[in-house]
Amino acid sequence: MLSPKKTKFRKQFKGRIHGTSKGGTLLNFGSYGLKAVEPERITARQIEAARRAITRQMKRQGRVWIRIFPDVPVTGKPAEVRMGKGKGAVDYWAARVAPGRIMFEIDGVPDDIAREALRLGAAKLPIRTRVVTRIDAGVAQEA
């Protein structure tokens, strides 16, 4: 599962996801991509589940690029522990995803397989998504 090797601080504030994605909104590697439509934190487990679903549908042909990385530590306190006594330990890592962000890109498979693979990958994610395709160089179009 994805997680940072080293961070400046062990714990972070929760934060909010405001507005649309500032970068990562165009296809850079593949011919098809999965674009976020709403803001959400995506956990490392969800990213891995989506990657596996996409790879399985593609029957290990072509190539998959993961364009998001879980760099936000999410903490939690154990069950039946009273409030206070500091912030809990890091439970898992998440990626903040804003609307418009390309999360996955794929290439090297036929159109119908690519769309089905991304649809199955999107089912593993907690947000609404849209499949985008490369019409001309560097431009993501709604599919």
UniProtKB/Swiss-Prot annotation:
Asked if Ribosomal protein is a keyword of the record, the answer is yes
- Source organism superkingdom: Bacteria
Alphabetized SUPFAM superfamilies for the sequence: Ribosomal protein L16p/L10e
Keyword Ribosomal protein listed = yes
Transmembrane ranges, per UniProt, are none
Recite the UniProt keywords alphabetically: Ribonucleoprotein, Ribosomal protein, RNA-binding, rRNA-binding, tRNA-binding
Q: Which PROSITE patterns match?
A: RIBOSOMAL_L16_1 (PS00586), RIBOSOMAL_L16_2 (PS00701)
Q: Which GO terms describe its molecular function?
A: rRNA binding; structural constituent of ribosome; tRNA binding
Return the NCBIfam families for the record.
Answer: rplP_bact (TIGR01164)
* Assembly behavior: Part of the 50S ribosomal subunit.
Task: Give the UniProt family note.
Answer: Belongs to the universal ribosomal protein uL16 family.
Q: What is this protein called?
A: Large ribosomal subunit protein uL16
According to its UniProt entry, this protein's organism is Caulobacter vibrioides (strain NA1000 / CB15N) (Caulobacter crescentus)
